[in-house]
Design a protein with these regions (language model features):
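All-alpha prenyltransferase/terpene-synthase fold signal
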Residues: 1-241
C-alpha cells in the first residue's frame, strides 16, 4: 500500500483502478506522510509477528528490492535507450518481488515456501506486463487511468520496447521528445505500437510468465486454495483493469 501511495504522488495520478487517489483528494503532503506511516506500520508488524530473524531478513531485503525497482524506474524516465532487459529488471523489483513475498508469507513454515515465492514472482511479472498493456486500452473507464499515461510520464514498457525493436526509426524521435511530447505525437506512438505488434508481443510475454506460474501451481497439493490460486492467475491475464 505504501509503495502505491507514493507511486501515485510520483506519477501525479488522479485515479487508481477508477478510484480517486489519496494525493488527488488530499494533496501530496498528506499522501507522502500516509505512505511513510504505512511503511512504519509494516515494519512494526514484522517486528511483532516475524517468527525468526531469517523471515525478518527476507522481508526487509524484499522491501529493499521493491524500492530499488521504483528508484530505477524514476532514474530511467524518458530514457529512449531503455531496453527490454532493463524493463524486466525493473518490474522484477518493483512488482514481482511484492507478489513473491506475499505468496511466500502465505506458505511460510511449510515445505512449499520457496515454491510459493517463485509462483508469486511469476504472477507478479505477468500482472505488471498486463498492467502496462492496459495503458494502451482505448477505454480508460475500464482501466481507471488515462490512456498512454506511462508513455506521457516517460515510462517505456514492454509494448513500446517491442515496437522500438521493429520500428526504431519511427518511434525513437517521438520518445526523444521527452516531456515535450504532444497529444498528437502520443497518438502516433499508439499507432506505431499497435501496427508493429508491440501489444501482441507483450501479451505473449505476459502469457509466458502466467504459464510458468500455473505449471508451478500444479505441483502444489490439490486443494481449494490451489484451485483458487490457479483460477485467479488465469483470470489475471485477461483482465480489463
Amino acid at each position: 500500500m505504501a509503495t502505491l501511495v507514493h507511486d501515485d504522488v510520483i506519477d501525479e495520478s488522479a485515479k487508481r483502478r477508477g478510484q480517486e487517489t489519496l494525493n488527488s483528494a488530499y494533496g501530496n503532503r498528506i499522501a507522502v506522510y500516509t505512505g511513510d506511516y504505512l511503511f512504519t506500520l509494516c515494519f512494526r508488524l514484522l517486528q511483532d509477528h516475524a517468527d525468526s530473524a531469517r523471515e525478518l531478513d527476507l522481508d526487509t531485503k524484499g522491501m529493499e528490492k521493491i524500492l530499488l525497482g521504483e528508484l530505477n524506474q524514476m532514474d530511467r524516465k524518458y530514457d529512449s535507450n531503455m531496453r527490454m532487459r532493463d524493463y524486466l529488471n525493473q518490474i522484477q523489483g518493483k512488482t514481482a518481488q511484492l507478489f513473491a513475498l506475499s505468496c511466500y508469507s502465505g506458505a511460510y513454515n511449510t515445505p512449499y515456501a520457496r515454491q510459493a515465492y517463485q509462483i508469486g514472482s511469476n504472477i507478479g511479472m505477468a500482472f505488471q506486463i498486463t498492467d502496462d498493456i492496459l495503458d494502451f486500452a482505448s477505454d480508460d473507464s475500464k482501466t481507471g487511468k488515462p490512456v498512454l499515461q506511462d508513455v506521457k510520464n516517460g515510462i517505456y514498457t514492454a509494448p513500446v520496447l517491442y515496437a522500438k525493436m521493429k520500428r526504431r526509426s519511427d518511434l525513437l524521435p517521438l520518445l526523444e521528445k521527452g516531456e515535450a511530447i504532444t497529444n498528437d505525437e502520443l497518438n502516433k506512438v499508439y499507432e506505431i505500437v499497435v501496427a508493429s505488434g508491440g501489444l501482441t508481443e507483450a501479451q505473449a510475454l505476459a502469457g509466458k510468465y502466467t504459464r510458468k506460474a500455473l505449471k508451478q501451481i500444479e505441483k502444489l497439493p490439490e486443494s481449494v486454495s490451489q484451485r483458487t490460486l490457479s483460477l485467479i492467475t488465469e483470470q489475471m491475464l485477461n483482465r480489463e483493469h
